[in-house]
Amino acid sequence: MASAERVPVSFNKPGRVPFGEVQGYAPGHIPAYSNKHDHFFSGERSIDDNVFCGFKYQCVEFARRWLLERKGLVLPDVNWACHIFKLKNVKDAATAEEVPVIAVRNGTEAKPEPDTLIIYPSSDVNTVGHVGAITEVGDDYVCIADQNYRFHKWEASYSYKLKLQHKDGVWTIIDDIDPNDVEIPLGWVTFPGYENRPEGAAPPALHPSLHFQPPEEPYLVRKTYEPTETKANWLDLNDPAEKLFVEEFGMDVSRSRLEETTVNYYECDHEFHLRCIAYGTQLHDYFMEATAQVINDDERLRIFKIPEELWPRMRHSWKYQQTYISGRFDFAYNNETHQMKCFEYNADSASTLLECGRIQQKWAESVGLDKEGTRGSGWAVERNLRTAWATCGATGRVHFLVDDEKEEQYTALYCLQAAEAVGLEGKLCVMYDEFRFNEEGYVVDSDGVRVRNIWKTWMWESAISDYFAAQAERGADWKATPADKVRLCDLMLGKDWDILYFEPMWKLIPSNKAILPIIYHNHPDHPAILRAEYELTDELRAVGYARKPIVGRVGRNVTITDGTGEVHAESGGNFGERDMIYQELFSLTKQDGYYAIIGGWMLGDAFSGTGIREDKSIITGLDSPFAAIRIKINAIPRPLTHKDLDKLAEDE
């Protein structure tokens, strides 16, 4: 039963400009594009007239384009936006000669100037700082044009105004738009001697030495490391999620239940990490696009073998719940061809999320890998998991519904902690014996709290099977009473259609491999997409193929056949009677006898991190060990705050 006054929930908040659309134009007709929200990172490079401007659509990307188009100058590479304040020079776009710049501290006798770059410091909530352009200066305000700070449509040639205070001869810019997060920018950077380029002028002729140089090909390498010292008891047994992990697997990131003397992990470069982000972000959009095509097309939807009786409910979930928490891509990479391909999207899964977001980093610290010039690949997971919960539309209590397996329970507890961190109330529910029906026939928990939000590890397919079994047992005229026992289907497919589910029912579509041929035919030229068909074609026979059930988990009932017709691997399981799809065979690189599958996490609508499942078999399964990924970095950037600038001034 659906409520007539139900309001749809969505990540697309009213007034927020979608990613990539123009928010407005700064003076000089320089566009600013929406980055969607603060924690979204596309991983896509922005190239303007052969200049690398940054990543779409971060604040530095706008600053570089603004400086090039407004002044004919090129901003050198910086790690973070705040580091622009420490620059001594930029370059002339035409000559590549160095051009001195002047950084002016905020809170001095100098009044801000228009056509300069305003720089924000590092903070607890934003380590990288921020940069924008000052477009206008009044006696008590400055106007700012920027990206990735506020996401509305501009009403003029700037995004917002900031307060400018003049007191005791000192000029101070104050960002108090959010009274709960007042910020004082570091200052602004000026470009003496460089006038603004004429409105509508052709792009400056760029010196060849400033042209963008493509990066080296990415790599992913399995490594063996012998720690010089190790930290015992590196997981917190007072943390419920970590305690359950230890009970199940011990102190071992690989979950192999073995003590480690030498350790194995995977190292990738920054380019590999960026490719995971870019492909994951793009593919998520493609799967959402294909879901929209399927859900209201009866002919296509029949291919997915979802019972037609449940279509109205699934369509209701698509219409009214456009929020979600987690999904994981399965990527494969070949170090010789430097190709990365997507095998599938586990859009209704949270398995190995704790391992990716917390365990692999704590393990790396316990064996000293955090001191080896690398960074964890799951650093954004916990932040983005909290953001997903904060924006998902749930209020009050969330029931975390799991089986009696410890792996499901620690995964649930990890997600529960993130929900509670943003003000929700979480309750772990192992099985469903504690639930009952109230007098109105709605499900309540042991505290009498009506179920309004459910996070679950149960497959929707399990609930559907139970739904039809219950129909057969209860009969057509059955109505729930407090004396009746609550079943799985009563929680997931009961009378209340307005319960928020994580993941929602419509994720039956993107998590079904029947979507893969649609994805391929929609975007056949995308470098990460493999050919996929509903029937075995001559093209697939020629290159080899994987035969997969449209509904299945953990690598069950998969057959891999090469281009000669020889079967290289096959797995058993309980999905063999399902319809099949045929996917182009992709050659994985075998390292130290192992094949690696990269799990790429979407949390909410943002790509958030990676982890690896490896196996000596080319088909990874439920028991395949987890392996950590470390991202090689040249140096760890340091924050820049007002105190840092004060100390630098003292040292000088």
From Swiss-Prot:
Mg(2+) 2 binds at E344, N346. Coiled coil: none annotated. It comes from Crithidia fasciculata. It comes from the Eukaryota. It catalyses: spermidine + glutathione + ATP = glutathionylspermidine + ADP + phosphate + H(+); glutathionylspermidine + glutathione + ATP = trypanothione + ADP + phosphate + H(+). Its cofactor is Mg(2+). In the C-terminal section; belongs to the glutathionylspermidine synthase preATP-grasp family. Conjugates glutathione (gamma-Glu-Cys-Gly) and glutathionylspermidine to form trypanothione (N(1),N(8)-bis(glutathionyl)spermidine), which is involved in maintaining intracellular thiol redox and in defense against oxidants. The record marks R328 as: Transition state stabilizer. This is Trypanothione synthetase. ATP binds at R328, F329, D330, K513, K548, G555, Q583, I618, I619, T620. Its EC number is 6.3.1.9. Pfam families: CHAP, GSP_synth. Keywords: ATP-binding, Ligase, Magnesium, Metal-binding, Nucleotide-binding. GO terms for molecular function: ATP binding; glutathionylspermidine synthase activity; metal ion binding; trypanothione synthase activity. The N-terminus is blocked. Mg(2+) 1 binds at D330, E344. Residues 34-174 form the Peptidase C51 domain.
